[in-house]
Amino acid sequence: MKHVFPTYKRFPIDLVNGTGTVVTDKNGKTYLDFTSGIAVCNLGHCPANVAEAVQQQLTNIWHTSNLYECALQDSVAELIADGKDRLVFFCNSGTEANEAALKLARKYTGKEKIITFEKSFHGRTFGSMSATAQAKIHQGFGGLVPGFTYVPYNDIEAFRAEIDEHTAAVMLEVIQGEGGVIPANAAFLLEVQLLCKKMGVLLIIDEVQTGLGRTGTLYGFEQIGLEPDIFTLAKGLGNGLPIGAMVGKANLSSAFGPGSHGSTFGGNKLALAAAKEILRTMKQAGFLEEVNAKADYFRYLLEVHLEALDNVSVIRGGGFLIGIELENTAEPVVTELRDKGLLILTAGANVLRILPPLTVSYAEIDQAIYLLKSVLENQLIGSEEG
């Protein structure tokens, strides 16, 4: 790719077709895609109902800007609000959604300090990069946006020592995806929420990777009983079309009036047509119950077949966001699996990250388990011989 900046270390395959969980490269080789485009294609590749909704919108109107009223925006926002007193700001990506959340928090509170957590990932624009507590993400870009403070994840005493009257907001993920697929302890999250309420600090939850059914509920925070002041969405909201959303309690609206923030393409009608059908699908009776049943089945098989292997340290995560921490580096496993027709990711040097579409079949889960076990066993034999 000689005309594209090398900002990604790309896998040496060019995927040109996809249906459901199966993708095909330009040479005709097929793969089971257990990456979902990094937790994006939650309904699988090219779901027919979403394609039909987008196709219908293509023949009507594509883009008008946010200078005009838009019934489609309002209907999608209502679906996102999910019966709660929430308002939505539409944008194009997760990092934009997080930028909007950070701006809203500072403007509403009039304070600057924002607490985030070590190994977090919130994006790569300057505000969201500054919120990301990973030195490797910051390297080479000079001074960060001031006002961000990082504390250890799952350490309530460290958090208690840091939150104060100068704090505008706390931003966190209920499962740190890029940071190694590390779940937060429920007790930790509930105590964070309690302290935020006590101190008048806004709680922001980054649901870019964990939201839209990925962890078994529409939003990951619902499983713990959290009520964030603000949360952010992207990835699965468009199933491959670029869309993000910052969702806040309605009482925050006074800080985000005309001219306070904006996005030229945010709320684009093509992306919204997809989002509306995706949300409608996920809210259908039995959909998330089936996702949870398949996720439980997958986790059970992972534990039965992989947990006892000497090169597997721990299996963690939630729903269809799974991390397998290895004793050795993860990249050789990912490479061998790709050669054998299974696509997965890493999350750090020694963690496999597995993100199948929510629509994956039981047979596809069985095949993935077979490949994972055979490759990990083969890697173990190779390391012993080496």
From Swiss-Prot:
Gene Ontology CC annotation, any one: cytoplasm
N6-(pyridoxal phosphate)lysine PTM positions read K235
Question: Which cofactors are required for activity?
Answer: pyridoxal 5'-phosphate
Q: Does the keyword Cytoplasm apply?
A: yes
Q: What residues bind pyridoxal 5'-phosphate, as annotated? A: G94, T95, F121, D206, E207, V208, Q209, T264
- Positions binding N(2)-acetyl-L-ornithine in this chain are R124, S263
Q: Which Gene3D superfamilies match?
A: Aspartate Aminotransferase, domain 1, Type I PLP-dependent aspartate aminotransferase-like (Major domain)
Q: How is the cofactor bound?
A: Binds 1 pyridoxal phosphate per subunit.
GO biological processes: L-arginine biosynthetic process
What is said about its interaction partners and assembly?
Answer: Homodimer.
Further remark: May also have succinyldiaminopimelate aminotransferase activity, thus carrying out the corresponding step in lysine biosynthesis.
- Name of this chain's protein: Acetylornithine aminotransferase
